[in-house]
Amino acid sequence: MPQPSKLLPARPSRGGVPAEHSLHPLPPVGRTFVAGFESTLHPAAGVDALDLSGHERQVGHDLDRLGDTGVRHLRYPLRWHRIEFAPGEFDWAETDRVMAELQARDAVPIVDLVHHTSYPAWLSDGFRDPRFGRALVRYAEAVAARYPWLPAYTLLNEPFATLFLAGHEALWPPYDRGIEGLRRLLLSVLPSLVDAAACWRELLPDARHVWIDTAEHHSGTGPGAEHARVANDRRHVVLDLVTGQGLDRRRPFLGRLTADGGEALLELPTLRVDVLGLDYYCHSEWFYDEAGSHAPSPRPVGLAAVAGQYADRYGLPLMLTETNLRGLPTDRVSWLRYTLEQYEIALARGVPLHGFCWFPHVDSTDWDSLLARCAGRADPVGVLELVPSGDRRRTVFTAAWEQAAAGLPAADLPAYRFQSPCDVQLAGLMPSLAHWAWTDPPPSQSVPAVPVELPAGDTPEHDDWSAR
């Protein structure tokens, strides 16, 4: 573990509190609602989605609105690129101000140290930069020393998804491609995550390490069945590598990943995860057949089954740390009802879920292009709608979310018929929602229906959780 940095103050300044300050516990098993604010640095433009949403200008106002709902737990970003402007030189002024706003409202944050590609510009080669590992550990140590009251933390948001998009799919910097590119980034990043986790365990032993990543499920028929088998192995490799879980090189994806120079990945020291955060969207489930790949899957097993798989595999406390739906407010109401219903089913089956997070609380920007375009284009996914002026607007979804956060069961939420394009994307869900009493959306939010044709193929077998 690295030694304490000489650059750190001897005691916390305005942003910190005495180390003996009592930590708020994370929520118990149940349906506690958790909020979240989106902060991702656009890879090409150097613009932060948090700024485009206007949150930086109205932190207090956003937190007051959230506090009015009774929701105290939230995922909250710390912006490395706005803290360490040069190697080893930290400017805490902005972060101290925001942390004080959280403390003043008795909020319980899960701080997000790095959200996707949100690292400083001086790391010119991003995750592949030879300075990245030491820099991440230095930054993580500095945060832990300055804010010893923090109750929970995420070191890197969605490490598998982030490094897969940056290292395998060439969508984000450093634009590597293929299994060789992914292997390169994992060798660069995972050792530093292990070291940073050890650092936090030493400095803040009572803080909870919340590991957050995509919660996927892959199924298929015919030639697609083998692809699904590989993808189902792939979804687990990053967490397995840092926890030492099932590292059998006969596994279809793990074996390829840890060959040809990747053997060191099997020898990483392990880190401890206290809570496993599941990010589940309609596109988290994929289906493969003769025609290719389909996401969202036309044969989804559902959130309850997917959460059960992760519970069985890792034996950890779980949280639903992200879900949303890009669509009209009425579409989001129905997706909230669906995911909350599935969450309640999982709880009834004994899945240890500790929180339900619709993410983000305010519309984000430019995710319709996976951040390839930085146009400030509002992404209609939030609890509060982002309008061109930067203000927030309440919608029918805002009211539904607030009712659910106050304890309203999923069955008592409205069931609005999905509108285009959500009706096409979510057609595979409809058999599992036959018990709903559907309602037409208000005329002001109606759009023409679009016919959908599902791919041919037999329904894939579901795992045991889907039948419990």
Please provide the spans of the model-predicted regions.
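N-terminal carbohydrate-binding accessory modules
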Residues: P2-T69
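Active-site region of glycoside hydrolase catalytic domains
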Residues: P4-V29, M99-A100, A104, V108-T330, ...
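Short active-site-proximal "capping" loops at secondary-structure junctions
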Residues: T40-H42, R79-I83
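Short, basic, glycine/proline-bearing loop/turn elements
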Residues: A45-A49, E84, G292
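Aromatic- and glycine-enriched glycan-recognition loops and surfaces
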Residues: L50-T69, A86-E101, P130-R138, P298-A305
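Catalytic domains of carbohydrate-active enzymes, especially glycoside hydrolases
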Residues: R57-R79, P269-L271, V275
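Conserved strand-to-helix beginnings and helix N-cap segments that scaffold or border functional pockets
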Residues: G88-W92, T330-L336
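Long, low-complexity, intrinsically disordered segments
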Residues: P451-R468
